[in-house]
Structure formats: C-alpha cells, structure tokens
C-alpha cells in the first residue's frame, strides 16, 4: 500500500515505515502530523485517485527531526569584465517517518 501526498508544493510517494525529507514544517520533534492532502491511494489492485484529493484519506507521520541540506553554490560571472559573485544556500528540511496510511 502506498499513497501520494502533497507537502511544501511538492508531491511525495510514501509507504508505511519509510522516512523522507520534506520542506520545513512547524512541528516539534517527536510530534505526529496528519496529511489530509492525499492525491492517490493504491492498495493492491484498488486504486483511488482524487479530484483533487481523495475524500477521507489520511497519512500520519512522526517528526524525526529538522536539519539542513548540503550547500549549493550560486555563481555569477561576466566574462572579460573581472566580475564574479558567489553565494551559498542551505535549505531547511523536516525528516518524517510515515506511521500510517488510511483511505
């Protein structure tokens, strides 16, 4: 059984027991989060596709922790003009463990 949820403007395919990293959520470590924006639920041969969400479907997850991704570098350069600019960015994330899929 798996589901497709929407979080942080992105869609994630989740399976019970799996851990995944999503955009930063305002939740404390150890707390439980319920996702109501379930776009699809697949259980064996049964497939439920929402329009836009599956009615009554929920995905629960436990917050494992928060952190930051690896640094990415943004570099601007103009050739022959001796102009170079560097910037770095580390995006925050929330790590979740999927505890249940219903629907």
Swiss-Prot record:
Keyword Ribonucleoprotein among UniProt keywords: yes
GO molecular function, one term: rRNA binding
Domain of life: Bacteria
UniProt GO BP: translation
Entry keyword set: Ribonucleoprotein, Ribosomal protein, RNA-binding, rRNA-binding
Keyword Glycosyltransferase attached: no
InterPro entries to which the protein is assigned, alphabetical: bL21-like, bL21-like_sf, Ribosomal_bL21, Ribosomal_bL21_CS
GO terms for cellular component: cytoplasm; ribonucleoprotein complex; ribosome
Stated family: Belongs to the bacterial ribosomal protein bL21 family.
Subunit (UniProt): Part of the 50S ribosomal subunit. Contacts protein L20.
Role, per record: This protein binds to 23S rRNA in the presence of protein L20.
Name assigned to this protein: Large ribosomal subunit protein bL21
Gene that this sequence comes from: rplU
